[in-house]
A protein has these predicted regions:
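Charged, amphipathic alpha-helical interaction segments
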Residues: 60, 136, 156, 160-163
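Acidic, divalent-metal-coordinating active-site segment for phosphoryl/phosphodiester hydrolysis
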Residues: 11, 150-161
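Generic preference for hydrophobic/aromatic residues in regular secondary structure cores
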Residues: 17, 36, 118, 177-184
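Active-site catalytic microenvironments for nucleophilic, acid-base chemistry
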Residues: 99, 117, 133, 161-168
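Conserved non-catalytic scaffold segment of RNase H-like nuclease domains
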Residues: 1-108, 113, 120-149
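Acidic two-metal-ion nuclease catalytic site recognized across multiple nuclease folds
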Residues: 161-213
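A residue-level signal for conserved active-site and pocket-lining positions in enzyme catalytic cores
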Residues: 85, 154, 158, 197
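Short runs of predominantly hydrophobic/aromatic residues within well-ordered alpha helices
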Residues: 111, 127, 155-158, 204, ...
Length: 213
């Protein structure tokens, strides 16, 4: 498995993983293929820690769901993983690092950053908003989103978003996707101050000098 889409659910914000899911993908000639037969989805126990109610309200994983499940430290990435794709993927990579996974050599591909580059004028770029956008507010999108915020469902939703990103940005292969993700992480517009919404390249020189002080 060279590339996977991965998602985690945690017991609290920036917490321990209580669910991890991933599926292998390939990118070839701007087309995405996902192998559902090799999808991995596992709940994990976290010792004496308790799931916060705020997190429970998001993913609906209860304490009773993780009783008797493997300890989170048992999680291993599939062999030969080079690329990990996900929405706000840095969060998930930090999470699996808590399992003892060496994430240093991993190339992270962030669909959140890519979506902001592909559709800069959208009001929101979370998974649900993007699914409604690419489906033009269809009933099918509503049905798909009923399982959102569980790791396995978010894998499929992220794959749907990525398919459209590949088309919009004309990305042909996985390494080009990684390069585009890295580039997309660099802000193009200012998000604060009197020049909020302005392109960084168009900012007055004196304002840029003030920012750099």
């Amino acid at each position: 498995m060279q590339a996977i889409i991965l998602d985690t659910e945690t017991h609290q914000l920036n917490g321990l993983p209580i669910e991890i899911a991933y599926a292998p993908v390939e990118v070839n000639q701007a087309k995405l293929s996902l192998d559902r037969q090799q999808m991995f989805d596992q709940l994990y126990s976290i010792g004496e820690e308790k799931i916060s109610y705020a997190s429970m309200a998001v993913h609906h994983i209860l304490e009773s769901d993780i009783v008797g499940q493997p300890h989170y430290s048992s999680f291993k990435l599939p062999a030969e993983t080079q690329y990990i794709i996900g929405h706000n993927i840095d969060y998930d990579i930090r999470t699996i690092a808590l399992c003892g996974v060496n994430t240093t050599p991993i190339k992270a591909i962030c669909t959140l950053a890519l979506a902001r580059r592909a559709w800069p004028d959208l009001e929101a770029h979370n998974i649900s908003a993007l699914i409604y956008h690419i489906s033009q507010g269809s009933e099918q999108a509503r049905s798909m989103l009923k399982g959102a915020h569980r790791a396995d469902a978010d894998i499929i939703l992220t794959a749907n978003i990525l398919m459209h990103i590949l088309h919009v940005l004309n990305i042909q292969d996985i390494e080009s996707l990684y390069s585009a993700s890295e580039q997309a992480r660099i802000p193009q517009t200012l998000t604060f101050g009197k020049h909020r919404g302005s392109k960084i390249a168009d900012l007055p020189k004196d304002y840029v000098q003030w920012l750099l002080r």
